Amino acid sequence: MTSIPFPGDRLLQVDGVILCGLTHKQAVQCLKGPGQVARLVLERRVPRSTQQCPSANDSMGDERTAVSLVTALPGRPSSCVSVTDGPKFEVKLKKNANGLGFSFVQMEKESCSHLKSDLVRIKRLFPGQPAEENGAIAAGDIILAVNGRSTEGLIFQEVLHLLRGAPQEVTLLLCRPPPGALPEMEQEWQTPELSADKEFTRATCTDSCTSPILDQEDSWRDSASPDAGEGLGLRPESSQKAIREAQWGQNRERPWASSLTHSPESHPHLCKLHQERDESTLATSLEKDVRQNCYSVCDIMRLGRYSFSSPLTRLSTDIF
């Protein structure tokens, strides 16, 4: 019957959810949620003095009566709403070359405490395909039956074979859950336990997210590895600097015998001295040949100061 709750009434059920065994906090949460109308089952105690014909078997001072009440309440959480309370409807689809044009997921009952069994939900509608063109199907709808066969109790592979093995025309019995009864498809399942489908989705996302990182790492290795650095001529440039700086020191000090018999690398102390002045200059092979084998007029005049019988003079004339 429909009535108004009175103080002292005992609340037994909210929209079919039995409150027996729930804590006070859980019971309060059941009275909050997105729904505007809720069905309550109350237990009302009727004092014995108000009864006209008391029962002979009544040993208690009052009588308890179950009262069914439909009343408007503020929003309630999804845990207190039956997911199959939404409107049920049938949709007929004809397969094309790509099938029915939608994907589905199986939401295990362990993922949500208020589910009585696994649910098969439509995850995505593909543009231009039969399911999307039908216009009556939406992501998140629950598939209750396929061509009259219930999906309750079926595992994911069985539902898949049921849809793939269906004839050209398929009749789907769908149910659209009340708002807030189940997580939105875009948000996946916000539950502490992972369903089989979510584990598969997470594995797929991990593969797709790590692949670009591997590609970037490979390209980084190709462009910035130590081997590649050597290939860019980093070490030859340092040796060229040493040659330039050693030759510059030779022109300043002119120890002729030692400069012609020793390699430029034998003067490491000259590198530091010349680094600030000649850092931007690149020594070419021609410049090295000129510096090693040719001398200026000043060098010749400087040679005149020495005796022509000296070894340095003989060595210089041999070079010229």
From Swiss-Prot:
Residues 1-46, 90-178 form the PDZ domain. The keyword Repeat applies. It comes from the Eukaryota. It comes from Homo sapiens (Human). PANTHER family: FERM AND PDZ DOMAIN CONTAINING 2 (PTHR46900:SF4), TYROSINE-PROTEIN PHOSPHATASE NON-RECEPTOR TYPE 13 (PTHR46900). This is Putative protein FRMPD2-like. Transmembrane segments: none annotated. It holds the Pfam family PDZ. Keywords: Repeat. InterPro entries: NonRcpt_TyrProt_Phosphatase, PDZ, PDZ_sf. SMART domains: PDZ (SM00228). Residues 215-239 are annotated as: Disordered.
